[in-house]
Amino acid sequence: MVRVRIPATSANLGPGFDCLGMALSLYNVVQIEAADSFQIALKGDYTAGIPGDETNLVWQSMCNLWEAIGFEIPTVSLELENNIPPTRGMGSSSAAIVGGLVAANEYAGGVLSKQQILQIANRIEGHPDNVAPALLGGVTLAVTAEASVIARTVHSQPQFMALAIVPDFYLSTEKSRNVLPASISRADAVYNLSRTALLVEALIHENYELLKEGMQDRLHQNQRASLVPGLGETLQVALDSGAYGSALSGSGPTILALVSSHRAEQVSQAMVDSLAAHGLTAKAYLLSVDSEGAAVI
């Protein structure tokens, strides 16, 4: 039997569109063991809409890895514990992919390194800023160069908490991507480039007072505001209530605030109240940055 724990992730971190992501201490668990017949058992907080057959993304990812290494696809039973909210911008798809790949690799004898698994994960997912932190942990920088991914950990365990405010509605990545413009101005490109550099500096050297400016964005948050009522106001409310920085998590609708532990409660309540004023109910998760990434447990 093999069990793997996979963290949630927050991608597009601040200005780091499609390149910066963060692993969070909210986990899905994949368990695989030999069986007489194929079956999938689902458990956890979020099971609705998760396929319990061979179309399941965890299983498809497993088969992808086994085929890549020439390992005969076995007859197994899977137990999938789903605690990451799906279609909310917290990396549920990446967790399924990475969890399936890591579990399949371990089941086959651990023949691939994490860097090799990362390449397969990116080919399946297409967004390295989600799969890299899910696999490696911490805050990661990931870029695609000539069809391969280069990923490095910017900081494995920053000394702040991550407050994820999760509105009670689904938002698909495809719908959220469709509102983005085909091109941007030079001014907006420079704005994001400079703040991405500032964000990396703030994280590496733990200069958290720089996060307020370092997490500002012009490439996707304003464009997606129409899909998340109260987004702009809630991002500002987080800062006004004492957060170091705030951003849309992934493609949304989850909103992320980086906070000190002693300010977490007041920031959380202010953000939930802000969304409520726009007719949305939301659940707050107070999380730490996961430093390990996907792990066999």
Curated annotation (Swiss-Prot):
Pfam families: GHMP_kinases_C, GHMP_kinases_N
Binding site for ATP: P85, P86, T87, R88, G89, M90, G91, S92, S93, S94, A95
Keywords, ordered alphabetically: Amino-acid biosynthesis, ATP-binding, Cytoplasm, Kinase, Nucleotide-binding, Threonine biosynthesis, Transferase
Enzyme class: transferase
Pathway: Amino-acid biosynthesis; L-threonine biosynthesis; L-threonine from L-aspartate: step 4/5
Enzyme Commission number(s) of this protein: 2.7.1.39
GO molecular function, one term: homoserine kinase activity
Cell inner membrane among keywords: no
Gene Ontology annotations of biological process type: threonine biosynthetic process
Record field: catalytic activity: L-homoserine + ATP = O-phospho-L-homoserine + ADP + H(+)
CC annotations in GO: cytoplasm
Coiled coil: none
InterPro entries recorded: GHMP_kinase_C_dom, GHMP_kinase_C_sf, GHMP_kinase_N_dom, GHMP_knse_ATP-bd_CS, Homoserine_kinase, Ribosomal_Su5_D2-typ_SF, Ribsml_uS5_D2-typ_fold_subgr
Subcellular location(s) per record: Cytoplasm
Similarity section: Belongs to the GHMP kinase family. Homoserine kinase subfamily.
NCBIfam families, alphabetized: PRK01212.1-4 (NF002288), thrB (TIGR00191)
Function (record text): Catalyzes the ATP-dependent phosphorylation of L-homoserine to L-homoserine phosphate.
Annotated protein name in UniProt: Homoserine kinase
